[in-house]
Protein backbone atom coordinates (compact mmCIF):
# COMPACT_ATOMS: atom_id res chain seq x y z
CA UNK A 1 0.00 0.00 0.00
CA UNK A 2 1.00 3.65 -0.35
CA UNK A 3 1.26 5.69 2.84
CA UNK A 4 -0.11 9.22 3.18
CA UNK A 5 3.04 11.20 4.06
CA UNK A 6 3.26 13.78 6.81
CA UNK A 7 4.26 17.29 5.76
CA UNK A 8 5.81 19.99 7.94
CA UNK A 9 8.08 22.97 7.15
CA UNK A 10 10.75 21.88 9.65
CA UNK A 11 13.71 20.06 8.08
CA UNK A 12 11.98 19.56 4.69
CA UNK A 13 9.94 16.82 6.32
CA UNK A 14 7.91 15.82 3.26
CA UNK A 15 11.10 14.97 1.35
CA UNK A 16 12.68 12.59 3.85
CA UNK A 17 11.91 9.66 6.12
CA UNK A 18 10.18 11.90 8.67
CA UNK A 19 7.23 11.97 6.27
CA UNK A 20 6.37 8.37 7.18
CA UNK A 21 7.89 8.19 10.66
CA UNK A 22 5.75 11.04 11.97
CA UNK A 23 2.61 9.74 10.30
CA UNK A 24 3.19 6.40 12.03
CA UNK A 25 4.08 7.84 15.44
CA UNK A 26 0.93 9.96 15.33
CA UNK A 27 -1.10 6.79 14.89
CA UNK A 28 0.85 5.08 17.67
CA UNK A 29 0.20 7.97 20.09
CA UNK A 30 -3.55 7.90 19.42
CA UNK A 31 -3.73 4.12 19.83
CA UNK A 32 -1.58 4.19 22.96
CA UNK A 33 -3.77 6.83 24.58
CA UNK A 34 -6.79 4.61 23.98
CA UNK A 35 -5.02 1.52 25.33
CA UNK A 36 -4.03 3.28 28.54
CA UNK A 37 -7.13 5.42 29.04
CA UNK A 38 -10.04 4.00 27.01
CA UNK A 39 -12.83 6.01 28.67
CA UNK A 40 -14.21 9.08 26.87
CA UNK A 41 -13.36 11.21 29.90
CA UNK A 42 -9.65 10.40 29.63
CA UNK A 43 -7.36 13.35 29.15
CA UNK A 44 -5.97 13.57 25.62
CA UNK A 45 -2.24 13.25 25.23
CA UNK A 46 -1.67 10.99 28.23
CA UNK A 47 0.86 8.22 27.64
CA UNK A 48 1.65 7.32 31.24
CA UNK A 49 5.29 7.70 32.24
CA UNK A 50 6.76 8.68 28.90
CA UNK A 51 10.35 8.81 27.65
CA UNK A 52 11.59 10.08 24.30
CA UNK A 53 15.07 9.03 23.22
CA UNK A 54 16.33 11.51 20.64
CA UNK A 55 14.89 15.02 20.61
CA UNK A 56 12.62 14.82 17.58
CA UNK A 57 8.98 15.34 18.49
CA UNK A 58 9.47 18.77 20.06
CA UNK A 59 9.99 20.12 16.54
CA UNK A 60 6.49 18.96 15.54
CA UNK A 61 4.35 19.58 18.61
CA UNK A 62 2.11 21.91 16.64
CA UNK A 63 0.89 18.72 14.93
CA UNK A 64 1.39 15.90 17.43
CA UNK A 65 0.05 16.66 20.91
CA UNK A 66 2.18 14.92 23.51
CA UNK A 67 2.15 14.88 27.31
CA UNK A 68 5.00 16.06 29.50
CA UNK A 69 7.77 13.55 28.98
CA UNK A 70 11.42 13.00 29.71
CA UNK A 71 13.52 13.77 26.64
CA UNK A 72 17.05 12.38 26.39
CA UNK A 73 19.45 13.19 23.55
CA UNK A 74 23.16 12.65 23.96
CA UNK A 75 24.22 15.48 21.65
CA UNK A 76 21.41 17.95 20.89
CA UNK A 77 21.37 20.85 23.33
CA UNK A 78 17.88 22.27 23.80
CA UNK A 79 15.66 23.41 26.69
CA UNK A 80 14.33 20.46 28.66
CA UNK A 81 16.62 17.93 26.96
CA UNK A 82 18.97 15.78 29.05
CA UNK A 83 22.33 15.20 27.36
CA UNK A 84 23.16 11.71 28.61
CA UNK A 85 24.02 8.41 26.96
CA UNK A 86 21.20 5.99 26.23
CA UNK A 87 22.78 3.36 28.51
CA UNK A 88 22.74 5.80 31.42
CA UNK A 89 18.96 6.20 31.28
CA UNK A 90 17.25 4.75 34.33
CA UNK A 91 13.67 4.57 35.50
CA UNK A 92 10.46 2.79 34.57
CA UNK A 93 8.25 3.90 31.71
CA UNK A 94 4.87 3.04 30.23
CA UNK A 95 5.74 4.48 26.83
CA UNK A 96 9.10 5.00 25.10
CA UNK A 97 9.43 6.69 21.71
CA UNK A 98 12.58 6.88 19.60
CA UNK A 99 12.53 8.22 16.05
CA UNK A 100 15.60 7.70 13.83
CA UNK A 101 17.95 7.77 16.79
CA UNK A 102 18.85 4.18 17.66
CA UNK A 103 20.85 3.72 14.43
CA UNK A 104 23.38 6.31 15.61
CA UNK A 105 24.25 4.29 18.72
CA UNK A 106 27.59 2.58 18.13
CA UNK A 107 28.15 4.43 14.85
CA UNK A 108 28.16 8.17 15.56
CA UNK A 109 28.97 8.23 19.27
CA UNK A 110 32.63 7.20 19.22
CA UNK A 111 32.01 3.57 20.18
CA UNK A 112 32.94 2.09 16.82
CA UNK A 113 30.64 -0.87 17.49
CA UNK A 114 27.37 -0.86 15.50
CA UNK A 115 26.03 -3.73 17.62
CA UNK A 116 25.59 -1.26 20.47
CA UNK A 117 22.35 -0.21 18.76
CA UNK A 118 20.88 -3.65 19.44
CA UNK A 119 22.16 -3.48 23.01
CA UNK A 120 20.39 -0.12 23.34
CA UNK A 121 17.11 -1.67 22.20
CA UNK A 122 17.41 -4.32 24.94
CA UNK A 123 18.31 -1.66 27.50
CA UNK A 124 15.28 0.46 26.66
CA UNK A 125 13.02 -2.59 26.75
CA UNK A 126 14.35 -3.29 30.24
CA UNK A 127 12.97 0.10 31.32
CA UNK A 128 9.40 -0.70 30.26
CA UNK A 129 6.76 -1.31 32.89
CA UNK A 130 4.52 -4.38 32.49
CA UNK A 131 2.31 -3.68 29.51
CA UNK A 132 4.65 -0.94 28.32
CA UNK A 133 5.44 -0.21 24.69
CA UNK A 134 8.60 1.05 22.97
CA UNK A 135 7.89 2.66 19.56
CA UNK A 136 11.05 2.73 17.46
CA UNK A 137 12.02 3.73 13.93
CA UNK A 138 15.33 3.58 12.12
CA UNK A 139 16.46 3.95 8.50
CA UNK A 140 18.31 1.15 6.77
CA UNK A 141 21.80 1.61 5.41
CA UNK A 142 23.14 3.55 8.39
CA UNK A 143 23.94 0.91 11.00
CA UNK A 144 25.30 -2.40 9.68
CA UNK A 145 24.26 -4.35 12.78
CA UNK A 146 20.65 -3.25 12.44
CA UNK A 147 20.67 -4.11 8.74
CA UNK A 148 22.09 -7.54 9.56
CA UNK A 149 19.38 -8.08 12.17
CA UNK A 150 16.75 -7.25 9.54
CA UNK A 151 18.27 -9.63 7.00
CA UNK A 152 18.28 -12.48 9.51
CA UNK A 153 14.90 -11.71 11.07
CA UNK A 154 16.27 -10.96 14.53
CA UNK A 155 14.37 -7.69 14.86
CA UNK A 156 11.17 -9.42 13.73
CA UNK A 157 11.47 -11.98 16.50
CA UNK A 158 11.86 -9.25 19.10
CA UNK A 159 9.12 -6.89 17.92
CA UNK A 160 5.45 -6.98 18.86
CA UNK A 161 4.50 -5.27 15.61
CA UNK A 162 6.55 -4.05 12.67
CA UNK A 163 6.15 -2.34 9.32
CA UNK A 164 8.73 -2.06 6.56
CA UNK A 165 8.51 1.11 4.48
CA UNK A 166 10.51 1.98 1.38
CA UNK A 167 10.56 4.62 -1.31
CA UNK A 168 8.51 3.87 -4.38
CA UNK A 169 9.38 6.68 -6.76
CA UNK A 170 8.15 9.87 -5.12
CA UNK A 171 5.90 7.95 -2.74
CA UNK A 172 6.49 5.66 0.22
CA UNK A 173 5.23 2.10 0.04
CA UNK A 174 4.44 -0.23 2.94
CA UNK A 175 5.99 -3.66 2.54
CA UNK A 176 3.98 -5.45 5.15
CA UNK A 177 3.44 -5.79 8.86
CA UNK A 178 4.95 -8.82 10.57
CA UNK A 179 6.07 -10.15 7.20
CA UNK A 180 8.73 -8.80 4.86
CA UNK A 181 6.97 -9.33 1.53
CA UNK A 182 9.79 -8.05 -0.64
CA UNK A 183 11.40 -5.60 1.74
CA UNK A 184 15.18 -5.47 2.05
CA UNK A 185 17.55 -2.97 3.70
CA UNK A 186 18.54 -0.33 1.17
CA UNK A 187 21.65 1.87 1.19
CA UNK A 188 21.11 5.23 2.85
CA UNK A 189 21.08 8.11 0.35
CA UNK A 190 21.08 5.92 -2.75
CA UNK A 191 18.89 8.20 -4.88
CA UNK A 192 18.67 11.34 -2.72
CA UNK A 193 20.25 12.64 0.53
CA UNK A 194 17.92 10.77 2.89
CA UNK A 195 16.76 7.26 3.73
CA UNK A 196 15.53 4.84 1.09
CA UNK A 197 13.84 2.49 3.57
CA UNK A 198 12.71 2.60 7.19
CA UNK A 199 11.84 0.00 9.81
CA UNK A 200 9.01 0.98 12.16
CA UNK A 201 7.91 -1.18 15.05
CA UNK A 202 6.98 -1.67 18.67
CA UNK A 203 8.69 -3.67 21.39
CA UNK A 204 7.31 -4.93 24.66
CA UNK A 205 9.15 -5.22 27.97
CA UNK A 206 11.79 -7.88 28.63
Segments predicted by a language model, with ranges:
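A short glycine-rich, Lys/Arg-flanked "PGG" loop and its adjoining helix->strand segment in the class I
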Residues: 112-133
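Class I S-adenosyl-L-methionine
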Residues: 149-206
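Class I SAM-dependent methyltransferase Rossmann-like catalytic core
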Residues: 1-44
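Adenosine-cofactor binding site in Rossmann-like domains, unifying the SAM/SAH pocket
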Residues: 62-98, 115-120
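A conserved beta-strand element that flanks and buttresses the S-adenosyl-L-methionine
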Residues: 97-102, 106
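Short, flexible/disordered intra-domain loops and linkers
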Residues: 9-14, 106-118, 145-149
